[in-house]
């Protein structure tokens, strides 16, 4: 089998295609969550704690001089990224929990009892007749 054919077989397997779709959707979902956090959630939180803009939160490690720029530790952007991560992780948890619940329900569906064979039916009839006699 040629190299190209092996690659096609590998790429067209269900797991690889599912993974690719998941990565694309995950990237898009990450952008949506980042926009939600940056534009919707963090401004009211900043307002509640005294009009703080989280993008500008930083510790200045060294002040700016004429020769060099200031050196600062920008922890506000880090806090926003943590909020992004928590929302994405929680969303993934909820989706996986729902999928597992659906999977369990389909596995728990009661199966019809097996139809007894002719021999089992005959043995049952013999047993019933013996009970009546004895």
Curated annotation (Swiss-Prot):
PROSITE patterns referenced in this protein's UniProt entry, alphabetically: MSCL (PS01327)
Entry-linked Pfam families: MscL (PF01741)
Stored HAMAP family: MscL (MF_00115)
PANTHER family membership: LARGE-CONDUCTANCE MECHANOSENSITIVE CHANNEL, MECHANOSENSITIVE CHANNEL MSCL
GO molecular-function terms, A-Z: mechanosensitive monoatomic ion channel activity
Quaternary structure and interacting proteins, as annotated: Homopentamer.
Membrane topology term: Multi-pass membrane protein
Function: Channel that opens in response to stretch forces in the membrane lipid bilayer. May participate in the regulation of osmotic pressure changes within the cell.
Keywords for the protein's UniProt record, in alphabetical order: Cell inner membrane, Cell membrane, Ion channel, Ion transport, Membrane, Transmembrane, Transmembrane helix, Transport
Listed transmembrane segments: 10-30, 76-96
UniProt main location, coarse: membrane
Name by which UniProt lists this protein: Large-conductance mechanosensitive channel
InterPro entries: Mechanosensitive_channel_CS, MS_channel, MSC/AndL, MscL_channel
The species this protein was found in: Prosthecochloris aestuarii (strain DSM 271 / SK 413)
UniProt similarity note: Belongs to the MscL family.
GO cellular component: plasma membrane
Entry keyword Transmembrane: yes
Keyword Transmembrane attributed: yes
SUPFAM superfamilies: Gated mechanosensitive channel
Localization per record: Cell inner membrane
